[in-house]
Amino acid sequence: MSQILVTGANRGLGLEFVRQFLNRGDHVIATCRNPDTADQLHDLQNLGPLEIYRLDVGNQDQVNALQKQLAHLPIDILINNAGIWRGSQLGHISIDEWMESFRINSIAPIHMIQTFLPNLEAGKDKKVISITSKMGSIDDNTSGGSYIYRSSKTALNSAMQSMRHDLTPKGIATCTLHPGWVRTDMGGPGGWIDAQESVSGMIKVIDQVSLKKTGQYIDYAGKIIPW
């Protein structure tokens, strides 16, 4: 049994991560901004050991406070899942929304890793997973647009590469993981796969993450993505 911290766990991919990890016997620490309204998340408590905490990953004080609350708890796997989408085509780019997206999509995952590093060092699996997007690939950008989301994920990818080098000496492996185009609130109804298929694939990838396979930019089916 692994102890796994999942952010953004109240819906979509985060909720499905919690469900599938519990179903296989793991202990899950799930966070979201409003646990009081996360009925679907609370419904999963009958599946196994699940702890639910309030956390806005963009609020540094909340992140620091939660780490102090969980300071005694080894974390085997940290899954930075929380993220936001802000549409942005040329001529309609909001600087405020761009800054917000960088705060949540790019900076918050790195702050989570930095803050919970003592917990990860105490864990047995020692894995850090950041959910990104293929839209963060510079090589794969053949259509333009989506300036805010693309750049926020590209920044995350770059930071995760630095994290790879810094965490390897500590025995912690990293993975920057693309879930596919998923039918969720964020992905919309046109997605190619559902959350169950995406998360099932991602968990298989996560299980293979090791110091020998650290720092990969990879999708839910195990395909390497060009940076």
Residue ranges and their predicted role:
Residues 84, 89-102, 121-168:
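Catalytic loop of short-chain dehydrogenase/reductase
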Residues 53-65, 95:
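The beta1-alpha1 cofactor-binding region of Rossmann-like NAD(H)/NADP(H)-dependent oxidoreductases
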Residues 79, 112-116, 120, 159-160:
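Hydrophobic positions on the long internal alpha-helix
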Residues 24-40:
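Conserved glycine-rich Rossmann-like NAD(P)H-binding loop of the short-chain dehydrogenase/reductase
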Residues 10, 14-19:
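N-terminal Rossmann NAD(P)H-binding glycine-rich loop of SDR-like oxidoreductase domains
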Residues 176-179, 188-227:
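C-terminal helical subdomain
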Residues 6-7, 80, 126-133, 173-178:
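Structural signature of the Rossmann-like NAD(P)-dependent dehydrogenase/reductase core
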